[in-house]
From Swiss-Prot:
Binds 1 zinc ion per subunit. Residues 63-97 are annotated as: Interaction with WWOX. It is linked to p53 is found in increased amounts in a wide variety of transformed cells. p53 is frequently mutated or inactivated in many types of cancer. A motif (Bipartite nuclear localization signal) lies at residues 293-309. The modification N6-lactoyllysine is found at K107, K126. PANTHER family: CELLULAR TUMOR ANTIGEN P53. It comes from Canis lupus familiaris (Dog). The modification N6-methyllysine is found at K358, K360, K370. Residues 55-84, 270-313, 338-381 are annotated as: Disordered. Residues 89-280 bind DNA. The modification N6-acetyllysine is found at K107, K293, K309, K361, K369, K370. This is Cellular tumor antigen p53. Residues 1-44 are annotated as: Transcription activation (acidic).
């Protein structure tokens, strides 16, 4: 009991007496003035809302002033790209057209152009000069773009690229050209190889250079870095090369195109396709107006075959000296007569020939017997 009584006599640190002493230390007036502590509303609401609430009630309620929504900025200007480039010929105001040097169909040629088919035949990674003709000089900063597309409609939306084998075989000689690009420019360090950000098509662009003194055209040397028969690449699908003349903003000033086949023997393939073209009797594609592509003269092989004349039924007498020669010619004649009779071309004539042949054969045998009898009589004498 004594211990508990002693504990009650000890004042706790925050007992009632201690609190009363602390309360007396506070000032008598303005205990909760705004100078000592901020208002509760100010602690919970932003300053703009508090000022709006403190305004006179007679004024119409207004929302706090906020900045007006700004219009969205213009979209970045991307160059306009068509998903399927047009191969249609468009000379434009500058009379843009293409030309090719005259080339034969020998086995040794590395490239050859067929005006009849409007088609270029070339070997892998061989230089193919293409002439650019204009009727008037284009504006400064004009460029020339080359792009490959598939010719058939079922493949035209696909991107023409090299096969995986040739893409892996790229070496340091490729220079700035990416390994997947099919068309490359030779001898021009200012060539740019581009991938369209919308269609992912490959193209190569070079600045347009005016013709040199004494020349009427500009020449660009192109290379094709994959065969048309490569699996995983073109895979025997025909392609077109589109050459466009463009200004600095990408607007097309002129356009032209031609078909391309990359093969091992350009001369042989050109001869074969031209012969098949004549056999089919397809109309010759008209070259673009003002083009320097010369069409081949029409071949005589396309004319209809002439009908064979009927056999002549007239008989002729041929005098032959010597029996051996006579027998030889007689056997030859009999063989020809038998051939005509078996072919059935002249049924009436063959019968007449056969009957005449039998009569002549009978006469020859009788004469032969008479000669034999005479010889035997001389021997017996």
């Amino acid at each position: 009991m004594e211990e508990s009584q002693s504990e009650l006599n000890i004042d706790p640190p925050l007992s009632q007496e201690t609190f009363s002493e602390l309360w007396n230390l506070l000032p008598e007036n303005n205990v909760l003035s705004s100078e000592l502590c901020p208002a509760v509303d100010e602690l919970l609401l932003p300053e703009s809302v508090v000022n709006w609430l403190d305004e006179d009630s007679d004024d119409a309620p207004r929302m706090p002033a906020t900045s007006a929504p700004t219009a969205p900025g213009p979209a970045p200007s991307w160059p306009l790209s068509s998903s399927v480039p047009s191969p249609k010929t468009y000379p434009g105001t500058y009379g843009f057209r293409l030309g090719f040097l005259h080339s034969g169909t020998a086995k040794s040629v590395t490239w050859t152009y067929s005006p009849l088919l409007n088609k270029l035949f070339c070997q892998l990674a061989k230089t193919c000069p293409v002439q650019l003709w204009v009727s008037s000089p284009p504006p400064p900063n004009t460029c020339v773009r080359a792009m490959a597309i598939y010719k058939k409609s079922e493949f035209v939306t696909e991107v023409v690229r090299r096969c995986p084998h040739h893409e892996r075989c790229s070496d340091s000689s490729d220079g700035l050209a990416p390994p997947q690009h099919l068309i490359r420019v030779e001898g021009n360090l200012r060539a740019k190889y581009l991938d369209d950000r919308n269609t992912f098509r490959h193209s190569v662009v070079v600045p347009y250079e005016p013709p040199e003194v004494g020349s009427d055209y500009t020449t660009i040397h192109y290379n094709y870095m994959c065969n048309s028969s490569c699996m995983g690449g073109m895979n025997r699908r025909p392609i077109l090369t589109i050459i466009t003349l463009e200004d600095s903003s990408g607007n097309v000033l002129g356009r032209n195109s031609f078909e391309v086949r990359v093969c091992a023997c350009p001369g042989r393939d050109r001869r074969t396709e031209e012969e098949n073209f004549h056999k089919k009797g397809e109309p010759c594609p008209e070259p673009p107006p003002g083009s320097t592509k010369r069409a081949l003269p029409p071949s005589t092989s396309s004319s209809p075959p002439q009908k064979k004349k009927p056999l002549d039924g007239e008989y002729f007498t041929l005098q032959i000296r010597g029996r051996e020669r006579y027998e030889m010619f007689r056997n030859l004649n009999e063989a020809l007569e038998l051939k005509d009779a078996q072919s059935g071309k002249e049924p009436g004539g063959s019968r007449a020939h056969s009957s005449h042949l039998k009569a002549k054969k009978g006469q020859s045998t009788s004469r032969h017997k008479k000669l034999m009898f005479k010889r035997e009589g001389l021997d017996s004498d």
